[in-house]
């Protein structure tokens, strides 16, 4: 008996596995899970993804990136078996039955209502054809009039149906427009079917009269702790859509920003006139002040000229002690004047800069000699002196100064300097010799030319005399 029972159980297990493998071939969307299961799966995925991310990452990441992350973490069930296993574990969805998808059937009453609406719209359009308003404005006005004519109960029903339609249509769209709701997931479990879903808690349009109230409601929902949930995000998206529609209606009706009336235009013109008059008055005042200043300066000049002619000191001089062309200088005592402050011996010893290499070598040798003399008397004092000198030199170098205390380099520099001096001297002598030689050659040439000219004149005269027969 036990063997037969085990064989039956094995056969049942094999059959179950085969059935599950066949079930897994059916897509999750086509299986027929009800909307509660789909919504809870979606909520589970969102909550698990949000747990993995920080607040900043949630805001910065797009819906597509979040979907990729969910797939990477294995939060999206790909087969029917995975969904069934999850549902068997959860308390809410322990009893699972596939749901048949039924196409929505239009009621005759609804059809009649729609026909009546169409007839009314056509009549009103024909009546308003003479007006210059566009067809879009006419249709929007007709809809508003119909809403006012209908009873309150019908109006409420319409609002509920429109809210449901907006939820189903715009539930995934506002992510693209406003970035508030998550985009529709590519996974089959996240795709919403045409079956009626649970109505979300939305704010009625009647309560939101102005855009300010809509903004307040959006702010309230965003400040809520559970603002990451899809329901609240849908509500925010709907509110934003309402606000946008209201703004579009206002623009179409022409109730935009307030236009400038004739009274306002007059007021603005008056203000401009007053400003212009004020600026003119200020300009006149400034010119008058400048004129007064010039007159006062001329008067002072006149008084100074008169006082100098009479030999009296001018008023200005008495006040400040300065006249325009006479300045008084305070002469210091002869002791202080021309007396220069001598630099200390220590500072002079440290001043090892410049190109006077001879004096620099002398300074370095002198300091070395003094240190050697001190070392003979007190070696400790000599070491202290050396350390002090080293520190002072290093500090000077750190400050950007130069300390030329290397004897070998100084001697080389001196030799180089002397060589340069000799070279320049030689160069100058050569230049002088050359100029002297050129000068002498030019002078000799000039003398030669002059002598030649004199000789030519003499020859010409002698030839003339010879021709005349005066000279044999």
Curated annotation (Swiss-Prot):
Q: Which Pfam families match?
A: SURF6
InterPro entries (UniProt xref): Rrp14/SURF6_C (IPR029190), SURF6 (IPR007019)
User: Has keyword Flavoprotein?
Assistant: no
Q: What is the lineage of its organism?
A: Eukaryota, Metazoa, Ecdysozoa, Nematoda, Chromadorea
Question: Predominant location of this chain?
Answer: nucleus
- Bias class Polar residues marks the residues at 197-210
Protein name, as recorded: SURF6 homolog gldi-11
GO CC terms:
nucleolus; nucleoplasm
Identify the stretch(es) annotated as Disordered. 53-73, 89-232, 249-350, 414-472
